[in-house]
Amino acid sequence: MPSMAANNFSRNTHQNQTKGDFVSRKQMIEQQRKNLPIAAVERRLVEEVRNNDTLIIVGETGSGKTTQLPQYLFKWGFCRDGGVIGITQPRRVAAITVAKRVAEECGIPLGQKVGYAIRFEDVTSGQTKIKYMTDGLLLREALLDPYLSKYSVIIVDEAHERTIHTDVLLGLLKNVQKTRSKSINGVVNTDHNNSNNGHALEERIDNQNDGILKSCQVKKYNPLKLIIMSASLDARVFSEYFGGAKAVHVQGRQFPVDIFYTHKPETDCIDAALITIFQIHLEEGPGDVLVFLTGQEEIESVERLIHERLRQLPECSRKLLTFPIFSSLPSEKQMRVFMPSPAGHRKVILATNIAETSVTIPGIRYVVDPGLVKARTYDPKMGVDSLIIVTTSKAQALQRSGRAGRDGPGKCYRLYQESFFEKLTDSTLPEIKRCDLSNVVLQLKALGIDDVINFDFIEKPDRSGESVTKHAFKEFEEASDRHQRFKFLHDCLYLSQSRNALKSFASPEGDHLTLLNVYRAADEFFQKNKMVHSEEKAEKNLRKWCKDNYINSRSLKHARDIHSQIVRNVEQMGLRVTSCEDDTLLLRRCLAASFFLKAAMKQPDGAYRVTLSGLIVQIHPSSVLFRAKPECIVFNELVHTNHSYVRNVSRIDYLWLVELAPHLYAVQD
């Protein structure tokens, strides 16, 4: 990833600048670009891309590969036929910050030649030729255009992170590349020796409308150029997956970093981190501090404790500013970590693993690493998806320490013993080997890939999880065949995103209908306000209404945004969005069809037995059905604390399950 200049993120770079300031700034940026390690190999990289349809570039963080390579490709004519250079990122903050930096380097407003697109935010135009985006967004584009026909080059950045989206995207791009190469005359030539995945994609492309085929005809002699970029030095897995694709290494720019370990194990990592932060602040030289923590709750706790301890220090020692960064933090607040510190002040960045490779924050000279990270795990036998705290891998620890050596010599304080480091695993297990594959299955089906089990993943999922998913998917298909499509999508969209309801909205049918009541009440309040006030005033009144009713306004806004997005997508597909009004029976039958793999029956002692796994659970105390104890329920989520609980619960009729999936559920007396 690039090293971001400290003041890259003002809304208008040229505003309030004199001509001299602008020239000086431009010269400084040009000098920064020339000094990047990748600049020395520009011509070689361009030639490698010309000569190889698939290229793997391994470059340390700070080499300049993310900002410079797309500009090189644009400069050397890779957009000449009207194509776009697309660059995917695992995280939205990286897509935004890099796009802003590249636009500034090009001396143009963001959204013209250079832009970015993330969920709910598209800062691109018809002029955009360099487009940064999240990998999930490119997958959504593939739903409407399976050829990805507008792209001449796609760069998958941070591929070493091996997220679910990245692995699915790599498999999809491998198929797209093959299929586009065969569309010499604008018509796909089906090769029956291809894998089923290829057939599925070809059939889907053949069925697209003429507009997409015409778009492809423009590029009929131009196969898709695919570039995989990784900060990991081991590129073998990517090279082998793409048939022995060539790998090129780009040197980074790394200053020496001194590593410090603890003498004994730390029992309280939060307290150890706080002590280390203040030791650095009070005893070390200039430079900002980057602290790795496991999540939002931990970050907010440490930030609060820092402020409490600062108040106990003399005025002259309080010049310490805290900046959090985690994935759910609003984008505008994430951007604040890149702002320069006021003179005489030191910044402390409190970050999740988002700061390991996705973003490079300038000015960091000190890193505090407790050696922990939150990771998603899945138990296929129990059907439990959990987010747990685990130790980092050696590769992650090295990435973290490297953050201190981007601008000059640095120091990394590992809050564990050196012997503990030696026992860490070499690398992190890919997400696809430790997560629920249900969503992946549905995503691949939506992309037109029927043989999901044999999809060409870069690494096959865990066999136990795969077999459970295969069985579940078979039942899902059978249930779908038996059950007609429900006609009240409007309410289902509301249900899928609502959060945080009050008892006054409670429905005796369960939590899902309670959430629907909350959403409907909020929407009715907003629509009435909009009739007599401006939209801005109506939004303000809605926030107050949320506060008065103890509803999380940010979650409600997120639900409204997603609802609007899904409605737009559904309408583009030609489907009608209707409501079931007050017919809750239909809605509960729809819930049963959606969550039939997550059903539970009441036991004589009042507990519940999950029908497929046999796990004994309780209804969570936050549920409106906690005291009601219906005979049969479906649920969204299973969580483990001192007990196993199910959350987001609705009452259903057991016979609905028998109708939906007779192979799983037998008729009971």
Language-model features: where?
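P-loop NTPase motor module signature
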Residues: 1-474, 540, 544, 548, ...
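Charge-dense polyanion-binding interfaces
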Residues: 315-322, 334, 479-498, 641-648
